[in-house]
Amino acid sequence: MTTDRPLGVVLAGGLARRMGGGDKARLRIGGRTILERVLEGLKPQCAALIVNANGDPARFSDTGLAVVADSIPDFAGPLAGILAALDWAAAHSPETADVVSVPGDCPFLPHDLVARLLSARAAARTPLACARSGDRRHPVIALWPVDVRDDLRRALVDEGLRKIEAFSARHGVAVADWPALPFDPFFNINSPEDAAEAERIATLRCGA
């Protein structure tokens, strides 16, 4: 028996090189880490959560979640993390039909993310769905059926494919839309300036 609620994977492998190093997901925004915010927003929407990260998994032990490393070597990018999550779902949660992927540097994910992705996919009758805010697509924030994993593995290993959009286009991807104002729900943090803007957004949201 399958479940409509997907497995959620947080792609937490990004390093904050422009912000002194370390895991970006551990940066604090409004008194809480980005990872805490991501998990808090995603947990009610998913059957279970895992973290995709390479290196020492113990650094995420406080989450209580399974930490799954890439099976493709040489840091092959977010598609490798998505494949790791699809493989984990097939092995540990066979009733799960889909995986929803989010990056570990987006602290303001919407609480209706999964519902809108599922709705967009059903309406378009495509296997995949991704988020868009304003006129900007977010291919890593997406819904993936577990049964694309073998094709994804071939694309990564045999073809050296690395671009999410190139892979998604092969299968068909629906788009779920969100407004980008008063703030972008998929705002991500890549610099000290982004972190300062995220603090401003967090303050606005607390006062809303």
Residue ranges and their predicted role:
Residues 2-161, 169-185, 192-196, 200-206:
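Nucleotide and nucleotide-moiety/phosphate-recognizing core
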